[in-house]
């Protein structure tokens, strides 16, 4: 069987068929390019939406309100386990499947989640505090109240909800095999979450109090009573690289207190810079630092 190992311009064997084949391939390529169906075009659109800069809500009274745009951040803790591979503050991010994102123009449902070292608000890590039963936009979120966490991912007219459900043999997290956390477009009881005070001895006393912004809290799933947790020691190979796993599981120490894996902050926007968050503000000096500055004559107050 004759085979043309040269280009179509060299007429060897069934050269006429090779020429028509090259023309058909070029027509197919140009048609996909005009319709925006090339893999590189779909990948570019997806990254453009997920990495689109977002603006967080700025709190005036120091509390979280329904309708606020926030980032869910697992704060860094120096006393965590030694086997972690990601240090620093980790923000909760949506993580679409790499293969499915190339096959479709829209986000896949359900969509995965991960924790990333990202302090800048973008489309994949900016969540919206939503009410469950009625429109309560502008009202203060309180401890013990049900709420939903929605995310658009930088897309227009698209809303996915943070959800979780009981673990089964066919449905669990990829690395730890614990209860899975995912994003879905269906509104149901698996979308409901509650904020709890970190100290268990004061938890009941704080029931009904406003949830402070940029402070450590617990986020518990109402249906399964599991806490949102970040696994810094388990990584996932995602569309954007290696990122930490996120599950719904409550970790308790010997004193029956939730571990830092379950600690989260609802981070709001920086009033000085609309494109940044409160994590970018410098921390105030401690009393020891102030005393040292005064002793050295460096007190600027």
From Swiss-Prot:
GO terms for biological process: cilium assembly; flagellated sperm motility. Expressed in airway epithelial cells. InterPro entries: CF161. The keyword Protein biosynthesis does not apply. Keywords: Cell projection, Cilium, Cytoplasm, Cytoskeleton, Flagellum. The keyword Lipid metabolism does not apply. It is found in: Cytoplasm, Cytoskeleton, Cilium axoneme; Cytoplasm, Cytoskeleton, Flagellum axoneme. GO terms for cellular component: axonemal A tubule inner sheath; axonemal microtubule; motile cilium; sperm flagellum. Its main location: cytoplasm. Residues 269-301 are annotated as: Disordered. It holds the Pfam family CFAP161. Microtubule inner protein component of sperm flagellar doublet microtubules. Microtubule inner protein (MIP) part of the dynein-decorated doublet microtubules (DMTs) in cilia axoneme, which is required for motile cilia beating. This is Cilia- and flagella-associated protein 161. It comes from Homo sapiens (Human). The lineage of its organism: Eukaryota, Metazoa, Chordata, Craniata, Vertebrata. The gene is CFAP161.
């Amino acid at each position: 069987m004759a085979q043309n190992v040269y280009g179509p311009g060299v007429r060897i064997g069934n050269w006429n068929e090779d020429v028509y084949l090259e023309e058909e391939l070029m027509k197919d390529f140009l048609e996909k390019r005009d319709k925006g169906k090339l893999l590189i075009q779909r990948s570019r659109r997806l990254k453009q939406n997920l990495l689109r800069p977002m603006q967080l809500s700025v709190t005036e009274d120091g509390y979280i309100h329904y309708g606020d745009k926030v980032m869910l951040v697992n704060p860094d803790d120096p006393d965590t386990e030694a086997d972690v591979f990601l240090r620093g503050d980790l923000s909760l991010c949506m993580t679409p499947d790499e293969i499915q994102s190339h096959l479709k123009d829209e986000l896949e449902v359900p969509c995965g989640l991960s924790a990333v070292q990202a302090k800048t608000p973008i489309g994949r890590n900016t969540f919206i505090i939503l009410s469950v039963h009625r429109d309560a936009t502008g009202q203060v979120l309180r401890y013990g109240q049900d709420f939903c966490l929605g995310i658009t991912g930088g897309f227009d007219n698209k809303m996915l909800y943070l959800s979780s459900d009981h673990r089964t043999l066919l449905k669990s997290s990829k690395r730890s095999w614990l209860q899975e956390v995912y994003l879905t477009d269906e509104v149901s009881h698996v979308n409901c979450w509650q904020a709890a005070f970190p100290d268990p001895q004061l938890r009941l006393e704080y029931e009904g109090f406003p949830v402070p912004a940029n402070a450590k809290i617990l986020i518990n799933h109402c249906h399964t009573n599991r806490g949102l947790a970040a696994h810094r020691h388990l990584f996932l190979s995602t569309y954007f690289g290696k990122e930490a796993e996120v599950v719904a599981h409550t970790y308790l120490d010997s004193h029956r207190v939730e571990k830092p894996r379950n600690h989260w902050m609802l981070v709001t926007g920086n009033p000085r810079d609309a494109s940044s968050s409160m994590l970018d503000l410098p921390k105030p000096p401690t009393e020891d630092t102030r005393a040292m500055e005064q002793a050295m004559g460096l007190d600027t107050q």
